[in-house]
């Protein structure tokens, strides 16, 4: 109707490439019924609790250790694997936000956490390399999130909320978040709108976000149910979004 052509073959090829990437990612994280991995050997009764909303270190007990091939009782220097503890300050990759990095220390060794992932059954996996000594199941461990990594990730996470508010102010209340990605170096924010933004609109949004950043508004953490969150005036939730009870 408007002399627009669609490269259907190219679209289908790109879609299939993305499907392959998604399947491979699920295999790495054992997410949503992925292929069997070493994590399937773990006792399903074992769980992890995240306690890192207001601190970056904690003491915990090591409940599971794995190499890349099997569940083990100990890791030695040079081993690559996963550490699971009962309580952790490490945030796992989810909701478009990359998981924390840092170190796990025991009296006998040190493990460098290269990424943190969410596993089936409420487990949080700290994936990385044993860089010094050894550690065993049952050891008391000191969990230490990288302060710089967490701080930069938090800044970009907060920026997505500032950006959403600025977009709704400039473009209208029809704007809804459709996805996002956050890590220490960048953010991506997907949203609904009827057309491409003009240079003037982009400049207005940028000015609003920068003004709010300059105000240094205090950031607080509240843990609440979805129903409670829907009653808070500053919260804009997507009507179609599926979330847990907390």
PLM segments and residue spans:
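A glycine- and charged-residue-rich anion-binding loop/surface
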Residues: 1-238
């Amino acid at each position: 109707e408007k002399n627009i052509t669609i490269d259907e073959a190219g679209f289908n090829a790109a879609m299939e490439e993305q499907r392959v990437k998604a399947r491979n990612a699920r295999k790495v994280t054992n997410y949503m019924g992925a292929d069997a991995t070493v994590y399937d050997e773990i006792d399903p009764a074992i769980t992890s609790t995240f306690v890192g909303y207001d601190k970056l270190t904690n003491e915990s007990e090591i409940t599971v250790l794995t190499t890349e091939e099997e569940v083990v009782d100990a890791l030695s220097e040079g081993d690559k694997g996963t550490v699971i503890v009962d309580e952790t300050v490490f945030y796992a990759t989810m909701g478009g936000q990359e998981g924390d990095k840092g170190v796990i220390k025991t009296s006998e060794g040190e493990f460098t956490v290269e990424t943190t992932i969410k596993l089936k059954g409420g487990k949080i996996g700290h994936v990385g390399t044993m860089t010094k000594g050894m550690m065993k199941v049952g050891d008391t461990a000191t969990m230490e999130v990288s302060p710089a990594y967490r701080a930069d990730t938090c800044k970009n996470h907060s920026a997505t909320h500032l950006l959403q508010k600025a977009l709704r102010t400039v473009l209208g209340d029809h704007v809804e978040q459709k996805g996002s990605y956050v890590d220490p170096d960048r953010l991506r924010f997907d949203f609904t709108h009827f057309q491409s933004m003009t240079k003037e609109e982009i400049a207005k949004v940028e000015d609003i976000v920068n003004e709010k950043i300059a105000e240094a508004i205090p950031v607080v953490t509240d843990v609440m149910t979805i129903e409670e969150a829907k009653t808070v005036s500053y919260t804009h939730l997507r009507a179609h979004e599926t979330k847990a009870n907390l």
